[in-house]
Amino acid sequence: MMALFELPQINNVRTKRNVIRALEKYKIMRVRLGERRMPKLTSTLTIVPPSFNNEFHSTTEESAIWNVDAVNEAKAYVKLIDHHINQLPERSRQVILTKFIEENSDYEAMLAIHVSHSQYKEEKRKAIERLAYQLNIVVEK
């Protein structure tokens, strides 16, 4: 009997790399939520003559727009990753949080979630795979 649906084989190394990149970006975005870009207080010298049109170029205005856009982008990304991490089964969520978010070593993460070495390796592989599928960043063979 043939299975109705089979998951494709995935490239574990490249998929793990994608998940780690996504989680690194997540950590950066969480920090960015506190960052604000300051407007330049001095004018810059340019050779380009000023143009007279309806466009208004204020560094203060541009900085304010950048701040709003950057914060909104960071909030959206953090919310997306938070949502997907929270959708994981409990053990997978523990692995992702202890290993990748808190940046513990494999040994420390294994002790924190109270599993054997072989169980930890299997749980870590499954957690990475599940999160990759949820984020749609799986690399197939």
Curated annotation (Swiss-Prot):
Family matches, as InterPro entries: ArpU-like, RNA_pol_sigma_r3/r4-like
SUPFAM superfamilies found in the cross-reference section: Sigma3 and sigma4 domains of RNA polymerase sigma factors
Record NCBIfam families: phage_arpU (TIGR01637)
Protein name (database record): Uncharacterized phage-related protein Lin1259/Lin1739
Biological source species: Listeria innocua serovar 6a (strain ATCC BAA-680 / CLIP 11262)
Lineage of origin: Bacteria, Bacillati, Bacillota, Bacilli, Bacillales
